[in-house]
């Protein structure tokens, strides 16, 4: 697949692709559903294949709750969780419009074995969150709710601390009190020796979970860090897409700048697997593969749109 795309790249044509066999088998798409080349094709490598047994371990037949279910990571978590056949899936989200959108999407998926429950609420509201966890007897929590845009959190640092750090503390304490089996925090590589407020809030959230994991309890706390996720909100991909749609220019601040990337589905599969492997207080760091040059990424996107990069010389 990557070889074919590499051959087509230089040609002045708009490249489109057919659905994968797995997408056809799951009923997500039909054979005649042509689409633009997917983001994963820009990685220049094949996505990591998941361990199916690990994907099922903490989900199949269980009551699962995802915080931040309307976000780019949270919604993909929900998509993958549905196909692992949980007993119930609770979409916990503070933003009404985001919750509405993700619920409408899942209503179209024929999954009679899964009860999907859209719940409005904030992890900062202890009483509300505890009532939900208790009422549904939640067994597994994936905590994806967070403020993650570095400049915005820097400008609104107190809200960043309240949401990312204290929100995690409240959610984790509720999990302990209600004897939730598994609690997985979606963290970031920016928590490593943090140089900004967002990274610091996530690092403190990790330390909170590690401290709680030392208590005598039946709840297993696990943290998973990953870096740049292709096409997530705030990444360069949506920005480049919009710039290409507008006819340019596509802005790259440094032609030699490199970043490590994963697709959203790939990252989420590894999050679910890491959550199943955790023993308590573990921090998993995802192997992001080989670095991708941002200039090359932008060039590929332009070429796959049937356009050419203008030679300024």
What are these regions (language model features)?
Residues 2-18, 88-95, 135, 155-182:
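NAD(P)-cofactor binding segment of oxidoreductase domains
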Residues 2-63, 176:
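Flexible, Lys/Arg-rich cytosolic regulatory linkers and terminal tails that connect or flank
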Residues 182, 208-258, 282-283:
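Conserved beta-loop-beta element that borders a ligand/cofactor-binding pocket
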Residues 27, 143, 147-206, 211-212:
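Conserved Rossmann-fold NAD(P)-dependent oxidoreductase catalytic core, especially the SDR/UDP-sugar
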Residues 232-239, 253-273, 293-300:
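Substrate-positioning beta->alpha
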């Amino acid at each position: 697949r990557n070889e074919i795309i590499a051959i087509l790249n230089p040609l002045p044509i708009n490249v489109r692709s057919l659905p994968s066999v797995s997408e056809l088998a799951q009923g997500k798409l039909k054979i005649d559903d042509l689409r633009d080349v997917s983001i994963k094709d820009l990685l220049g490598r094949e996505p990591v294949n998941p361990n199916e047994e690990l994907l099922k371990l903490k989900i199949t037949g269980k009551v699962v709750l995802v915080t931040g279910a309307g976000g780019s990571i949270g919604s993909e978590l929900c998509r993958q969780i549905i196909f692992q056949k949980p007993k119930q899936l609770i979409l916990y989200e503070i933003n009404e419009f985001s919750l509405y959108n993700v619920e409408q999407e899942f209503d179209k998926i024929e999954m009679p074995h899964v009860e999907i429950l859209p719940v409005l609420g904030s992890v900062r509201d202890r009483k509300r969150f505890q009532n939900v966890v208790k009422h549904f007897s939640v067994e597994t929590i994936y905590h994806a709710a967070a403020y993650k845009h570095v400049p915005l959190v820097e400008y609104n640092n107190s809200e960043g601390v309240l949401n990312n750090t204290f929100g995690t503390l409240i959610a984790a304490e509720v999990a302990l009190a209600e004897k939730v089996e598994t609690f997985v925090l979606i963290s970031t590589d920016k928590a490593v020796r943090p140089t900004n407020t967002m990274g610091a809030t996530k690092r403190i959230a990790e330390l909170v979970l590690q401290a709680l994991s030392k208590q005598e309890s039946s709840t297993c706390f696990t943290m998973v860090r990953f870096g740049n996720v292709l096409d997530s909100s705030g990444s360069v991909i949506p920005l480049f897409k919009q710039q290409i749609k507008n006819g340019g220019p596509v802005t790259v601040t440094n032609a030699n700048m490199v970043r490590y990337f994963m697709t959203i589905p790939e990252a989420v599969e590894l999050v679910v697997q890491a959550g199943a492997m955790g023993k308590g207080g573990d921090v998993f760091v995802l192997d992001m593969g080989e670095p991708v040059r941002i200039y090359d990424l932008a060039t590929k996107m332009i070429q796959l749109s049937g356009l050419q990069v203008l030679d300024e010389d």
